[in-house]
Amino acid sequence: MLEEGEHVLVAVSGGIDSMTLLYVLRKFSPLLKIKITAAHLDHRIRESSRRDREFVERICRQWNIPVETSEVDVPSLWKDSGKTLEEIAREVRYDFLKRTAKKVGASKIALAHHKNDLLETVVHRLIRGTGPLGLACISPKREEFIRPFLVFKRSEIEEYAREKGVPYVVDETNYDVKYTRNFIRHRIVPLMKELNPTVEDAVYRLVSVTHLLRNFVERTVQDFVERNVYFYKDYAVFVEPEDLFLFLEVTRWVLKEMYGRVPEYEKLIGTLKSKRVEFWSGIFVERSFGYVAVGKTVFKKKYRVEVKGDMLEMEGFKIRVVNNRNDMKFWVRNRKEGDRIIVNGRERKLKDVFIEKKVPTFYRDRVPLLVDEEDRVLWVPGIARSDFLPEDVVVELLEYPVGYVKGGTYFEQV
């Protein structure tokens, strides 16, 4: 967790947990041969927050520990954020810690989380509707963050602090049950402890195993992504995994990679029940003929572009049209309602052709159709060639999005 010569930034609120962590790291820093710096952020949520800041600064002077402090008006940021006050405070705090660590040259950031914090987080996530891997929370070490106290209960830390006379301040809002975390701590956890007095240890074991499971799943997902996920201009496509759990995790990964967030697990499960599910701001997941598309709903503008050269590239397609006729002009456009094509003397709806050839629904408005001046469909790239397209006009589908044509090849007979 710590190596000789490292510089550790210690997150200190002034409460008993973080002050005890600062005390322990200061005490053992000569033995561990590490350098420590304290960091305190005033969230300006409470009137007494300035008192906490001054307390931390005073103790750090007494203990000869460098300290970095700052303040952020979290309530102002919270007003129009659409998030809870606790969520905003956490985001601001972690941002401050990362920036401060970089400023002072610290390679590690020490946090005072313990087993009770772990229990409260698990309960909170279960209430909100987490997936199974969502229980892999608060790891002992992740990126630059370390949590040396995660193996201890709150009661053990408090007992040690009393024995050593560690100074600290009390945050009066810790007892205000209007905050979700406090409600869990003071109302729900005591009931759980009536059923199992060592519930903190039980949850710690559960989370430890879930971390191992998450690591395995992350490796499996990464391997699948590297082999099967394709990103285009405004969407991604991948082969639909046979395993439903892998499907959910790959979908989560793609959503986070593209948009920086994921839906609640309950909403994500909805993709197993429906062919198409929309989340926030028009973001969708659509399943069709063994492929999955993830993107943002965009109402495609109808276009009609004259073919003037041999090569055209659009919507992930690359086509070649060699016009050997001086008496004909061609255009490409996307499909229209009621489009039909005549092949071998038989007229068929373009929609039926797409279904028969198992063209995923999310490609049907993207494929560039070759038409004549009468707007008749002459060629559906890789799918069908009309009787009206002269034989001396050369057409070829050179590139296309994954899954557009099955089997990795294309054919033009209907």
UniProtKB/Swiss-Prot annotation:
UniProt-listed Gene3D superfamilies: HUPs
UniProt keyword annotation of Zinc present: no
Main location class: cytoplasm
Entry's EC annotation: 6.3.4.19
Listed Pfam families: ATP_bind_3 (PF01171), TilS_C (PF11734)
GO molecular function: ATP binding; tRNA(Ile)-lysidine synthase activity
Secretion signal span: none
Keywords: ATP-binding, Cytoplasm, Ligase, Nucleotide-binding, tRNA processing
EC class (word): ligase
GO biological process, one term: tRNA modification
Ligand binding (ATP): S13, G14, G15, I16, D17, S18
Keyword 4Fe-4S attached: no
Family indicated by similarity: Belongs to the tRNA(Ile)-lysidine synthase family.
Function: Ligates lysine onto the cytidine present at position 34 of the AUA codon-specific tRNA(Ile) that contains the anticodon CAU, in an ATP-dependent manner. Cytidine is converted to lysidine, thus changing the amino acid specificity of the tRNA from methionine to isoleucine.
HAMAP family associated with the record: tRNA_Ile_lys_synt
Name of this chain's protein: tRNA(Ile)-lysidine synthase
Originating organism: Thermotoga sp. (strain RQ2)
Gene designation: tilS
